Amino acid sequence: MKRFLPVLLALFMLVGCSNGADKKAEGDKQKVRLVLDWTPNTNHTGIYVAKEKGFLDEAGIDLEILQPPEGGAEGLVANGGGELGISFQDTIAASWAKENPLPVTAVAALVQHNTSGLLSLKDKGIDSMGKLPGHTYATWNMPIEQAMIKTMVEDDGGDYSKVNLIPSNVTDIVAALKSNVDAVWVYYGWDGIKTKVEGLETNYIPFIDSHPEFDYYSPILIANNDFLKNDPDTAKKVLAAISKGYKYAAEHPEEAAEILLKASPELDKKLVDESQAYLSKQYIADAKQFGVIDKDRWNAFYGWLWKNKLIDREIPTDFGFSNDYLPQ
């Protein structure tokens, strides 16, 4: 699924948006707006389950789910155009590595481990990162992305200079792999499953197998800092309901898939069913509960970015996330 580029101008956009959490919705429920990162998909299923099963209603929350602007959810949430949003630990890093960091905080991990990796057709023979040289790779042209690929290729004995980089924001993985693109960075739970559903034979290399630092959090639920400061009770209520939704989706993948399809009937049923079967096992995985962020893993990735000069300023230890709003 598509990821947006970092929000480079977000700090200059902090005008003109009211805080919707200050308004009571119909029936005296508290209105909260959540900005997605992309069109609805199985990363979001727990949110739709929380709505459909009444968990949000029980918490007194009227949740409005919004599509993101072209720049992604981060800037809109920082501006006060949404109380919550979906982002990624890697792409938001540059916005936090500033004198005035983007005023948002990660309050939950939607998927417990990084499920991204390199995907290619099996007949290309790219069954390890060291075999990527001599092939084409679709790049977002993001420094962090390219540095990670370079590190993994070279650590596996490959010559990164021989990787043919093709700037491309792939939106159709099947079409891309059937064109002049040999390898793509994907999230297996959607694009990897899509190639499986389409009957393609592929090689998939999970990035977390290469470096423990690459087991960062992706995607994450972020919240506006003023919202957290001024209305922590509402933040905790909505997080409790969403957590309940993801726990239910983890335990009932087939029903969860039907709920997502009901909310977004334009989605391909077979893809959603297969993707949900995979991701339902990833929402919580080996964590003690849904959403919890391990500080060591969080800090390890940002430490790697700073060590490799991929951010302008060091991100302080334990900065940018909080587990305090999750159910205790």
What are these regions (language model features)?
Residues 27-159, 164-167, 178, 182-186, ...:
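Short, glycine-/small- and polar/acidic-enriched structural segments
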Residues 229-308:
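Secondary-structure end/capping motifs
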Residues 2-10:
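Sec-dependent signal peptide recognition
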